[in-house]
Amino acid sequence: IGLGLARQCLAEGMKVVLADLRPAPLQELAAELAGAGASVIAVPTDVARAEDVAALADAAFTGYGRVDLLFNNAGVLLSGFSWERSIADWQWILNINLMGTVHGIRSFVPRMLAQNSPGHIVNTSSLAGLLASPLMGPYTVSKQAVVALTETLHYELQAIGSLLKTSVLCPGPIATGIADSGAGHSLRASVSADANEQLMGFLRAGIAAGMAPADCAARVFQAIREEQFWIFTHDEFKPAYRARCETLLAGGNPVYDAFSI
């Protein structure tokens, strides 16, 4: 998704700062884009580390003088029963998915405010940011927190009369590698092993057939132009959002029926 957003920025004539945990692929991509005439700065960054994101902001403002669009997009995923995932697994996901967004806000927003000019911040949540499901505890918690954080930021910027706008991106299946982001975080002896395998197969199939990142990016930029807070990529999930809200207002108990455990 991040690469799709970067390519869309470049297609619209912008200068881009790229961040990724892996230095070698990041530099290769930057060289490829620069070779095609793009203005690109690449900064290896672990978004879980506040000092890394602060250095990323320094590089962006030093290199280009200003930042008008900020995309807090890094994300990872693990599955398994909530009580089976280790504290380290919980911390790993929350540090990247949630705290990475917090670090982005803290490092970039004060300087963007000081510019006193229009700008936009897009935080990537997920379908899971609005709909919980079994076996996705750490991921769902992190993504629902990103929704709450982005709403809070929206209200705060509104309260001070800022020209900065915010959006939260809640994508459905997008053709990315997120299903494999948890390699190396295997579940130990687990009562959820079969259900976990079923879920991951379901996710991988959906992601493989998912929306192209370029199409996702096009929707994001349309929302930026229209100053829309909520960005959805798959309208077919809206009935599920509505059903959840209706159940909540009726005081009903949640029911999950996408697949059986």
What are the language-model segments listed below?
Residues F81-S82, S86-Q91:
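Substrate-binding pocket helix/loop in short-chain dehydrogenase/reductase
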Residues P23-A24, P44-A55, I87:
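The beta1-alpha1 cofactor-binding region of Rossmann-like NAD(H)/NADP(H)-dependent oxidoreductases
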Residues I1-V17:
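Canonical Rossmann dinucleotide-binding motif of NAD(H)/NADP(H)-dependent dehydrogenases/reductases
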Residues I105, S142:
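Active-site helix of classical SDR
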Residues E12-E28:
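Conserved glycine-rich Rossmann-like NAD(P)H-binding loop of the short-chain dehydrogenase/reductase
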Residues A159-I231:
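SDR active-site lid
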Residues S126:
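Residue(s) in the substrate-gating loop at a strand-loop-helix junction
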